[in-house]
Amino acid sequence: MTYAVDTNVIFDILFADPEFGPSSRDFISQFCNTNDSLVACDIVWAEASAACNDKAAFARLMNDFGIAYSPMPDSAAIRAGAIWRLARSTSHNAKVRQRLAIVPDFLIGAHALECADALVTRDRGFMRRWFADLKVVDPSKAKRP
């Protein structure tokens, strides 16, 4: 299976989050020596790389985590745009309805839906609301499926 990894899980480990870091680290480390793979899309890659001081350190970090770069296909970007349009049109928040720039989580969810079998994230509610067909795995709630 291919698991897309959300930024919050990488940050849990990178910043040694006292509440979520251990469960995220344990979950990700279970993928060593398996046929399963971990991937991260462009958005996650950009968000996580911003937390590192240099390109080489970031590359080592992602390699150590066993997470491969998986670029966003145009079909996923278009799907994200359609779901974002729906979210804007159904929102009760005027600021959301007027916002034109897409929220990154829509891109992350659409990428996972099209390029992976599941998304590893702690943002279960959002992903389940907007990506009902996406299998969501919360490392703080479950062991590797």
Feature map (PLM): residue ranges:
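A short acidic, often aromatic-flanked loop/helix-cap motif at beta-alpha or helix-coil junctions
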Residues: A46, S75-R79, K141-P145
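Conserved beta-strand segments of alpha/beta enzyme cores
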Residues: S37, G66-A68, K135
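Short, well-structured N-terminal submotif of metal-dependent ribonuclease cores
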Residues: M1-A40, S49-N63, R144-P145
